[in-house]
């Protein structure tokens, strides 16, 4: 075939005249070729391989090459001929078109001849052309062979060689072509309309090879640069699919692959080339292929056409054009083989295969559009399209449409003749496409042959419109549609006729082929069609004849003229249609396409309809197509058909217009639908966005998102810094290597660069570190909510149940309380009273439940509960409940502490009585009896056996109080809970479930601990758990009670009952009603505290409270208010502590549980319920603690007392502002009550110390005596319970307790008053402080109680007296407080409290001094001289002004500027700093000795008061100090020990204030101890630093009131400074003033009325809230500045510890001083916010628990040891050290918490020595000697440890508690827990040391210490021991430190 084809081609090619031969040959070949082509192009390629044909085709191809490259011409002379041939062809094609119009045989013949000529020349020009022409096979083969061969042999080599123009050579390509290894096969390269055959290179290595081939094939048109541009793509045809795919893998190139260069930019595509040579060549090639496929029949036409085509369309070789039509024809033929059955079929297939691919390849658009359009549908259509593509390359867009339409039209027409016509037409079309727009071509195609011819005509005139129109539309699709339309019509007419008319092909083809002229396209088409028919042979001719030829030709002849006219009309019509369509379609290309298709379809239909004959259709088509070229197009023969077609065209136009209108309408409708859809989508999107925004706007979610973003930002920054650091390290390493190696020299510039980079990195790291605390706080805040929610969900049911129970029991309790008021209040000291207390507790348990509900509503009431000793228990419980609720987050275990005091919230659980008493305690406070019962109540909870009687007493108390407060409390609780629920609603169920599950798991872990304590303790624990739950549930009640206790006036607003604290949560209420976050230490303290308050309670509390505190009973509801406050304040800590506590609770049943629970208690109210909390601790440490108690009843009593106080302090602190508020309220009420009680009787006060005091203040004025006796019996019963709980210890304690109760009762009263005064003062400045003071009072009571065995009772009595004194003093102080706020007009005086430095006028100073008396330490500074005068310093202790105990007033005799006064003050502080430490050490020792007796208790109260004062503000501190002084006076009245304690307390207050003004602390201490002695400012270094900074600020700003934020625990972290600053700036004078005023008023009212007006309570609450807010802010600030504060904090801590301890010790013996220091230290932490200071106090007792919340609980326990560490830490002032110390403190504290009561004693001594080192070494020794006091005076330990702790880490045992608390609190919840534990320990130790209970830490400390140590040792033993050791070393009080260490380690 190849040879034949080649031969034929050659003859044909050389002689363009041979075109006819070619057509003939082509025909014969076409059959073969077409078949082969149909199968695939390879046959053609093979043909192309033929030399002759190659030559022939080459020329054909060369034509394009002419354009492509001059070089390729060398392949054959044909190349040279091509240009001339092309011109000739064009001319001939025009002639053919003219002839074609007649559509007569002659025309066809002429067309055929032309085609033949074309074939020859076209073959020369395009190998495809010949096939397209007449000789299908021959031509195709010749053309293909020639072109292929020429291209592959001649051209390929030359292209590569000559292609060197673009690229000299691609080795692969060149080698392949040069070697001419045909074995590889041939490649068809198509560019534009040109198709060239090239020999495949030996190897195609890359696309560059292909590009080189293309460049060599088309050197003129293509360059490597062009081909490499992104806009040019090489496509390879997939024969199977007739689709071009982008050539991605050169391995896909195989023999006969058709590659096409496709310019993605249609405008740039191949229009120039295409129109010129490329189009022709491509058309030729397509024709060749198509013809090979199906040109058998067409070939004659093609042959005839080629000449025409060539002349007609120089741009696009006519042959190619004709060829495409032939392929399309063939498809039609295929469809209707009738036309050219054999030929058509074969060619069609071939055409479809080859042409389609070609068509696809020819036009870039075609490729894409073909896919879209479906040229594939009809192989013929595809062929047409392909041909068209070739033509199209001239105008890709035009061609596409043309192609489409051609393909469709051809597909529609089965006749081959039409195909041929089309082929010619195609040639025309190609040229048309070159000239026309695709739309025009498409239309022409629609008409099919006619259309094509017309489009050829149109192309020039018409095309623009159509073209433009079509391009927008997908030409292919338009073509298809038109084809479809045409086909149906044609079919209806009859396949032959239809096809023929459509293909009126001869004329049409000629016309189309003439497209060069476009006018003649139709004629040529007809001619070509005829020729093709002829060429095809009889079949074609016949087909044409019957279908087209005969009719068509005559028609053409007849109508030629008419046709021309009609065509003109049609052209105009088409123009109209086009314009219309164009306008419409322009809007949417798809619409245009469809409209065009429709138009073409209609035209076709019209043609078919109008011309029943093919001619008519053809005429129509021609008319429409030609009318654009009317002048040039000769009217086809048969005007009538043309006329008909014109009419049809008009109809079509009308229809098209209608369709256009419809389409426009449709478009509008679609637009409307789209708009609607868009609107709908917009609505949906907006809704979603709104939902998302709402979700984002949800505060919780938004906060979470913001925090997460911040965290990611932080992490990103961190990563960046780490990267920088790594790079810097590498750089430095390289420098080191370079420096070490002699070869390279390190330049100074390199080093400097490294240093510069290092500085940058260091700054970045520092910045990052500064940013972390903020992020930490934010993340904690976010987590806090979840934890709270979980707790709430878990505790709410219990809370509700307990509330209901309490409400139910309220009536009974009230009845019992009335009975007790009349019958049993004075039985407090009798053994029967223990039973009574048990019964009362049982009764109170119910009452407490109710009360707790009320308390939840009125948190202030829990403070009232604190008033009486039963009240204290209750108030502890209530605060606990309040705190618990607040701290439940951290640990529901809080309920454990509660359980003592009736497990405040869960009286039912552990000791219904005990729990209820706690709950009822607030009511009890309201009633005198209640307070007395309250104390027993707590004991009762401690001792399950006594629980019943105590519970009854408690219930009665609670009833009395609850009767008053129940409704309000319940309402408040309900409101709070409702709020909480609403808040919780923010959480989704799943989260809650998860949190609940986790919390439950933690709680379950903790619960075993509840049951772990000794038998009694397990029972207590169970009760405690229940009580705690009840407390938690009743938290509102507890708060209510507190409020009631607070003296009808609502105490600090009860924190919302957010959470009930589990018994193990570690929240307790102190006697003062403060909610203490008790860690294990707290539990112990609570136990001890209950003991002292009522012996029964002390006894009972230790076991039960430990159970309660330690047993993670159901989430204690107690202290919801406190909890809320705590939640806010220590949510993060709580969360951490809770997690830790839960985890630790399980393994630390005694110690760990205490620790864990204490953490919780710290978070909650364990410490607040000193007794309650202590019991859990005691229960867990019960064995140890009981042993300790047995060893030393006094110690045990004191230990519990101290512990209770510590717990209270810790609880207060942890509980946060709410706790403080409660405590303050309680303290106030206590003070008032105590005042009354004092007036009434010591015994009464003993009975009512805290709770009684508060209640007495309100209720007890009348019930004082009964209440006192009840307190005694309550104490006894409590003591008995404690004894039972501790077994021996508790019992022993009970006996001494009764004795000491009276003794200590007075002392306790004094202390309590003092503490309460302090608390009141603190309360005024900071409600939390009041709570702390209350705790202090409780502690004091506890300490006193220990003397009797229930030092707590005594303490409470003392607290009661103290409270009364405080109230009086506060009353005085209140005016003073306001005056304090005012700057001195004449001589300036500074009132330095722990939290604030206030400028006072002399008048204000006088008022304050007169009001507060001993509670304020005054230092007169004449010039440089400072004289400390103790307002009411009874004992001549060293005149050390220590903020620990009292506010320090520094009076400058000479008038001066505020700023200068500040400067002076700072100078004084600096001068006094060194002395302060020494003084503190000595003072501590002295105070320890003094306090050994009963000063411990007083001191504890004092410390608490001081802490409270500290936490409040300087003014508060001063008031507290003033209170302390009055208390000290009371102490003087009572006993020197008590006085000492009071002094210590006062000093502590001053120390507490002193952190604000460190020197003042020392001054106050000195004043306290010996006004005559030269005052020394004893401030923990942290405090001192804080004061110094505050003063500095004052110097700058000249503000009258400076907030001193001393965070003892933060000291190490630097939180202290932050706290100080935060406090200094956040705590406004108004707050302290308000608090003080409120407290003073409340106390005053309470004293006279025994009740606080609601308004006062409201005021207190408000002030408390304000304080809380400020505290929170302060905490944040502190946390932010922790690192900065770390050093100062450490210094302050040591100073503070010394001051605190010193102050306390001076007042309460050395131990009290340490304790005060501890409290102070704790207070400084408390100052973080006012609450913080309270927490600091709480940390002393319960503050540690705060820290304890987290790991801190352990620290609390280890606090003694931790204290040492704290000193170290503060001395080290290294955050890491701080962390380590705190960590050890945390662990130790947490672990030791349970054993805290005993451990604190031992630890405190150890710490005391360490403290002693700073200034409490003496205290430390004093602690050892005066262990009872020392334990009682946690500060003693705190002092000793604080000193060192201040030096190292004031966060250790006592100082650590405070420091850890503060530091930890700010640093982390764990620290808060630590603080609690430490405080607990300190308190416990103080209690243990308390002269009443434990004379020396030796006996209790050893057991306690071991226990503590064991517990603490677990967590912090190692650290603790080192800390102790370091403390020893630092303190130089090795003796004490050693014993303590030994004990602790043991």
Curated annotation (Swiss-Prot):
Glycans are attached at residue 357. Pfam families: AIP3 (PF03915). Residues 38-47, 477-488, 1176-1194, 1509-1518, 1622-1644, 1765-1777 have a biased composition (Basic and acidic residues). It is found in: Cytoplasm, Cytoskeleton, Microtubule organizing center, Centrosome; Cytoplasm. Residues 1-83, 113-176, 305-324, 339-374, 455-512, 853-875, 891-947, 1008-1221, 1482-1567, 1622-1664, 1691-1946 are annotated as: Disordered. Residues 352-367, 1806-1825, 1890-1899 have a biased composition (Low complexity). It comes from the Eukaryota. Disruption phenotype: Mice display a kinky-tail phenotype in about half of homozygotes with defects in the nucleus pulposus and annulus fibrosus of intertebral disks. Shortening and curving of caudal vertebrae 20-25 is apparent by the age of 2 weeks. Disulfide bonds: none annotated. This is Sickle tail protein.
